[in-house]
Amino acid sequence: MNKANLLHIDTNIKITLLAEVSVGISANSILFIAYLCMLLGENRHKPIDLYIAFLSLTQLMLLITMGLIAVDMFMPWGRWDSTTCQSLIYLHRFLRGLTLCATCLLNVLWTITLSSRNSCLAKFKHKYPHHISGAFLFLCVLYMSFSSHFLVSMTVTPNLTSENFMYVTQSCSLLPMSYSRTSMFSTPVAIRETFLISLMALSSGYMVALLWRHKKQAQHLRSTSLSSKASPEQRATRTILLLMSFFVVFYILDTVIFHSRMKFKDGSILYCFQIIVSHSYVTVSPFVFICTEKHIIKFLRSMCGRIANI
């Protein structure tokens, strides 16, 4: 991809990308602040709330980093040096991988939380809250090692056009790598993503079975003239299934666009589309939490009421 072409991409694409980043930053900030206030408040909170706060913070940092990269792609105010390129691209890749793993673990933890007492997962219910901090630390160390090659493969974009460099932004490019070296870095990533997607598929399948069982119970309750309102378990199950549906759709689109880019030498527009699609989930997911979690809605309403009374 020619570095000059990024500056001449259609204005609508630039606006879409920057708007997506801005909306995502705002939504994740609201979600993180809401959960942080609930965690620091006197009200009792669920152990999984801490993990949702961690996920929203990770997504917020990812979008902020992407915003800085997007500015250098379209509106370069000054060339970055090699250290800035390596640090920002490394941080972005690290946060992107960490977000994927955190989403997967949130799915698994939610499955454990909603499992019945007779389920084989019930024995983990009282164990996982005590291991969340350790899981955070393990994930950070793991994904720091996964992304470490960007510290040595990222360099300042040369002034002269070269087909051997892969342009990331106006200031940063990836150094050319041999096929064996590329495979050495890409294989662990492929294995990681395959494992995480499979784990999410299994937990989502369990969720579907759980939702079907609750639906049968609801039909029985209606037949006995009892309340037919959705239970907290049903609402939580629908929330996580909705999140996973968004994740799968955006992941498939991202994969299709990535392979399409590989077929074109000058895929600047596809490159921007891939960035938009790959960050769509982290932009949409906080809205799912905000709109479906009743305690978040109540908290935001109370905050708005306090602000209005000031």
UniProtKB/Swiss-Prot annotation:
PROSITE patterns: G_PROTEIN_RECEP_F1_2
Lineage top rank: taxon: Eukaryota
Cytoplasmic face of the membrane: 42-50, 115-131, 212-238, 290-310
Membrane topology note: Multi-pass membrane protein
Pfam families, A to Z: V1R
Gene3D superfamilies: Rhodopsin 7-helix transmembrane proteins
GO terms, molecular function: pheromone receptor activity
GO cellular component entries: plasma membrane
Disulfide bond annotation, renumbered to this chain: C85-C172
Location, primary (coarse class): membrane
Its biological purpose: Putative pheromone receptor implicated in the regulation of social and reproductive behavior.
Similarity annotation: Belongs to the G-protein coupled receptor 1 family.
This protein's name: Vomeronasal type-1 receptor 44
